[in-house]
Curated annotation (Swiss-Prot):
Residues 3-284 form the DegV domain. InterPro entries: DegV (IPR003797), DegV_C (IPR043168), DegV_domain_contain (IPR050270). May bind long-chain fatty acids, such as palmitate, and may play a role in lipid transport or fatty acid metabolism. It holds the Pfam family DegV. The keyword Transcription does not apply. Keywords: Lipid-binding. One of its GO terms (molecular function) is lipid binding. SUPFAM superfamilies: DAK1/DegV-like (SSF82549). Hexadecanoate binds at residues 62, 94. This is DegV domain-containing protein YteA.
Amino acid sequence: MTFQIMTDSTADLSPYYIKKHHLTVLGMTVTVGEETYETIGEAALDNSTLLAAIKKGATVHTSQINSGQFLEVFKKFASADEELLYLAFSSGLSGTYQSALIAQDMVLEEFPSAKITVVDTLAAASGEGFLVEETVKLRDSGKSLTETLEVLSDIIPRLQSRFMVDDLNHLARGGRIPKAVALVGTMANIKPLLDVDPEGRLRQVTKVRGKKKAINQLLEKSLEEMDTAYPRLLISYSGTDEIAQEIKKQAMQKKGISDVDVRPLSPTIVTHTGDGTIAIFSISRKSRE
């Protein structure tokens, strides 16, 4: 391998994929009531436990990865003289990216020739995972880190993240969206559709009456703007996968789509979205506006 790849637990990557491609993944922690859980490894919190606690009214929150955790991992790669690329959770949603930059500076003081590169994906959930997977493809095809970074600088601004959340109050409580947006979502049968803006922050793009219409609009917009050089969709969900599988079925009937993958959102993300979330990720022809 030409370089090592690292990301965090928000990327919705399966343990199988992480192991198969030799990825390093750091996990944020999730606190449910008075109990704090890991989100990576055999003892990781699962979504069914988390959603059951949320349904019962438990207070839940996440804690970002701190600079000390990054420092420990970065030093391991630096001391082994290995080249590392860390793809970080959006700086518009968490301080994790800044923590990584602090750790990077500290490592360079001790190992001036360390090859540690930190990239802000400006993405979350399977959008971040999408970028990790494209990075893996590039690395495994023999591309250098420099060549890979050139591709990432092109596709990161064009990554589209569109989603619908059943209960926006979870995002509002975590400060991810304004409370006024969440209030609209409580109105009868009104579904605000959200995306991730160019700075990696969540925003409302429109309001649709009815869940089915909202989901159809998510899919249609993703397909309409898709770059045919990246003919794939990632569909993520919280709770049951019934709706996500139906979206996949619809998408696979469209001309030009070669790959549609359905996967659960990670507990780190579900903590902020709750049950009933549907998200669609794709690479668009144009940059986010």
